[in-house]
């Protein structure tokens, strides 16, 4: 499945802000190509946190590795995302949001991070700010799709719309665009399944 969709699929299922697996040396959805050094730091942090997340010292070590990655490459999306996820897991929602906003100061149109930050705002009770972030995410998912025709951007655009408008309107919009988004029946079935998951998941589940 497309890495960009996994980024937000796992996000709205509240498992993590990024794919759980470590990253290979590939460009991210924003087009940034990180140096291999920072990828190694990120992957080390993921490994430490994945295997020893119950240890305060290991959590601290993972955070230190991610901070080093961010210091070396301030545009490295996954390091910010993992740091925000680990802070969230420690109950530090405000710091998690600050981490995503630090990335967005440098990359204000990156929709996957906008969507994640919007969910944090809503979880913290700031629904108005959350809606603004969802809207910005929706607009930029559309922009990215028009640029590279990556189907994942459009599926995630429907997720942003669902958060703003609710499932009924989102379903109607998807049905109107369903055929345009799929080049074949197999792709259409995959899209249908992904969108139905978005539509049928209760909103409160997104905010747990």
What is the meaning of each model-derived region?
Residues 46, 85, 119, 159-160:
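Residue-level recognition of tetratricopeptide repeat
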Residues 68-69, 102-103, 137, 144, ...:
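Canonical positions in the second alpha-helix
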Residues 25-30, 160-208:
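Terminal, low-structured helical/coil segments at or just beyond the last alpha-helical repeat
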Residues 20-72:
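N-terminal leader/linker segments that initiate helical-solenoid repeat arrays
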Residues 79, 113, 147, 153-154, ...:
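TPR alpha-solenoid repeat register
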Residues 54-65, 90-102, 126-136, 166-169:
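Structural signature of tandem alpha-helical TPR/SEL1-like repeats
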